[in-house]
Amino acid sequence: MKVTLKHHEELGPLVRATRKCQGMRQDDTAEGIGVSENFLAKVERGGGTVQWQKLFQVLTELGLRVEIDVPDAAVALLQEQDRMRGAKR
């Protein structure tokens, strides 16, 4: 099921629910992923100061993917910027 997140605080409960559905304890999960239990707890609470690299490490290890619905106009702009960079080379 795809879930659209509107705020960073909404990600934490999804991480926690996924971990619990997999029957994993917080301390064991953190150790297995290579992050501190304190960090994983911050992720699960939706802490705003979470380090992105570690956050994606946690998400990947739990089998969660982040999908972003990008407006067509933004995709077109990025493609145009890529073409412009390619033309300058």
Identify what each model region corresponds to:
Residues 1-20:
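A short, Lys/Arg-rich alpha-helix, primarily the initiator
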Residues 13, 23-24, 50:
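Residue-level signal for the short linker/turn that defines the boundary of a DNA-recognition helix
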Residues 17, 21, 61-64:
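Conserved amphipathic alpha-helical interaction elements at protein-protein interfaces in regulatory
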Residues 24-41:
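Short alpha-helical DNA-recognition segment
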Residues 53-69:
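DNA major-groove recognition helix of helix-turn-helix/homeodomain DNA-binding modules
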Residues 67-89:
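Short, charged recognition helix plus adjacent turn
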